Design a protein with these regions (language model features):
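N-terminal amphipathic/basic-hydrophobic helices that include classical n-h-c signal peptides
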Residues: 1-16
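Rhodanese-like catalytic fold shared by cysteine-dependent sulfurtransferases
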Residues: 12, 17-152, 165, 175-213, ...
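Phosphate-interacting basic helix/loop segments used at nucleotide- and nucleic-acid interfaces
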Residues: 155-160
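Structural scaffold elements adjacent to functional motifs in cytosolic proteins
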Residues: 170-172
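Substrate-contacting helices/loops that form the catalytic groove of nucleic-acid
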Residues: 219
Length: 361
């Protein structure tokens, strides 16, 4: 498909709602089908930068217009503190995309983290460019906190040295459901569901290691960079973080023929759900707790929609549901189920108020 066709396809389908948010308003199923069958080869990437953006709304509009024309899909969050982008770009339009990024002073030289692996299904099937208060939700309200006062970067080679050093502490700054399917050897993996929660507990959790060397890591670098600044703000002196996160670590290991210290898969927030970093399966099915599995599913009961790990046997036995309660609930009349939609959280039965199941570690 030629570049001009992207303008027709995507301009016609993207509805500009407000200066804060531009979204494709077609039904979810229609969007997924259209992208899945369009035959366009895409490059999945992520990038972020903590940089002062004077007018996030205008910046949002400019990016949305250009990304729409180029046929880009994904989630791009913009705030006064910077930009956080997870997206894919039609390969045929990559040079135009890269040239556009370089026209933005705020983005010149921003490093791209290219996906470790592309899968059969596209990583994204819609484009969202949105203005937010923060590019990654942190729950912090301390006006004296300087997000730019970060720890130094660690290369993959240096990070491996930290992993091997008994006097160093390696900390996973991702959520528990992410580290469950993959993490670095000997890493501290806090049992939290959100980055906001982890920032809250990290200073207390790590205070016994305050005088040690601390190395932080996350998916692509955005969370551990902010976390390094937060720990320094709380009196930690020797804090560093993995440059480019797990994604770039994998690329560095391959380029430099280094030992891979990451075990399992890297959870990603797109349609792929994960990328293979190590060869091991380290997690277990949440339904039986006996069979190893690193494949995530969402419960077919939309009132639940919990994220869980399932083995082939349990998925077949429960038909894609996380429990027999959900199987039973989903057989209720449609009028009854409407009372318990995902958007009516306070009305849900107690068993549907959880976000995800945590299984055997």
């Amino acid at each position: 498909m030629v570049a001009g066709a992207f303008r027709v396809l995507y301009d016609a389908k993207t509805i500009m709602t407000t200066p804060h948010q531009k979204r494709d308003m077609r039904p979810r199923g229609e969007k997924k089908e259209a992208v899945f069958h369009d035959g366009i080869e895409r490059v999945t990437l992520s990038f972020y930068r903590y940089v002062k953006i004077e007018n996030p709304e205008r910046f949002c509009n400019e990016l949305c217009e250009r990304f729409t024309i180029l046929g880009c899909l994904g989630r791009i969050y913009i705030a006064k503190e910077g930009i956080n982008a997870q997206m894919n770009v039609p390969k045929i339009n990559w040079d135009q995309f890269d040239a556009f990024i370089k026209t933005k002073p705020e983005l010149v030289g921003v490093p791209y983290k290219l996906a470790v692996e592309e899968k059969n299904a596209p990583s994204f099937y819609k484009l969202i460019v949105k203005v937010k208060k923060k590019i990654v939700a942190d729950g912090l309200s301390d006006e004296s906190f300087d997000v730019t006062n970060t720890g130094a970067y660690l290369s993959a080679r240096e990070f491996n040295d930290y992993v091997n050093d008994p006097d160093a502490v390696v900390v996973d700054m991702r959520n528990a459901y992410e580290s469950e399917i993959g993490h670095f050897e000997n890493a501290v993996t806090p049992q939290v569901d959100t980055f906001r929660e982890e920032l809250k507990v990290a200073p207390e959790l790590l205070k016994i290691h305050k005088n040690k060397k601390i190395a932080l890591y996350c998916t692509g670098g955005i969370r551990c960079e902010k976390a390094s600044a937060w720990l320094k703000h709380n009196g930690f002196q020797n804090v560093r973080h993995l440059k480019g996160g797990i994604i770039d670590y994998k690329h560095q290991v391959a380029r430099e023929n280094l030992e891979n210290k990451f075990k399992g898969k890297n959870f990603v927030f797109d349609e792929r759900m994960s990328e293979s970093i190590g060869e091991e399966i380290i997690s277990y099915c949440h339904l039986c707790s006996n069979t190893k599995s690193d494949t995530h599913y969402h419960c077919k009961n939309l009132a639940c929609h919990v994220l869980f790990l399932g083995c082939d046997t349990c998925i077949e036995k429960k038909k894609g549901y996380c429990s027999y309660k959900c199987v039973t609930f989903d057989r209720l009349p449609k009028q009854v189920k409407k009372l318990f939609t995902r958007n009516s959280h306070k009305n849900k039965p107690e068993q549907f108020k959880k976000h995800r199941l945590m299984g055997k570690r």
